[in-house]
Amino acid sequence: MKKHKIMQQKKYIARSMVKKELKFTPKKEKDTKIARTRDAASLVLLKKTRKEVKVLLGKRSEKTRFMPGAWVFPGGVLDKSDYKIPETTKLNNNIIQKLVVSNNVQAANALAIASIRETVEETGLILGKKAKNVSHINDENINNGITIMSKKGLVPDLAKLVYLGRAITPTFSPIRFHARFFMADAKHLLGKIKTTSELVEIKWIPLKTATKLPMADVTEFMINELIEYNGDISLIKRKLENRPMFTWKMGKQWITRK
């Protein structure tokens, strides 16, 4: 069984190198410095129906600089305001240890909040919880997904998050991220889907056929990871010690688990 899985993984790596990465990851000019990574977070949302499991994906605008036209999970770059958000439910302590933030609870919470905030901004969907006396952020420069939530009396519900994995953009890209992928069950969501300038199409796609869409290798990898577990969030939660880190080294995809 173990040998079979290893063979499957090697086959997947070779296929992904040819099909995905070259299309959606920009290349830096030769002899330029390697770009520093920026912290980012995505929220993978799954919906279970009687027949199948579906995943929420959005199509990026063709006008965007990074991965134009690719289908992605909602998410984005960590913002300074994500550190200022009060009154959230607690993120699982075991997840904090997996995020590579030196067990810094504030940094871990900020990443989790970023995934929820970006999802609100890009899709209109909210992973939130009603709270009494919600504190609004007294900063005129902050007008984002968390502001939208606070006006509805909601706070980010970090307790509903499950950790899927992380990824680092390869060094040959001029735009690089250290992304953490959280996930949650759609039954916990509030709000309605609405397209934005960033995601011009948003759909619930059957998990088993989702990789047929144009997407980056890391998105495909994470979807295949979900398929391995049949989209079972509770099972993935129990298998926390086996979460992947996805990157590229020496021109090849590099996947570690610990």
For the regions a language model picked out, list residue spans one by one.
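N-terminal leader/linker segments that precede catalytic domains of diphosphate-processing enzymes
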Residues: 2-258
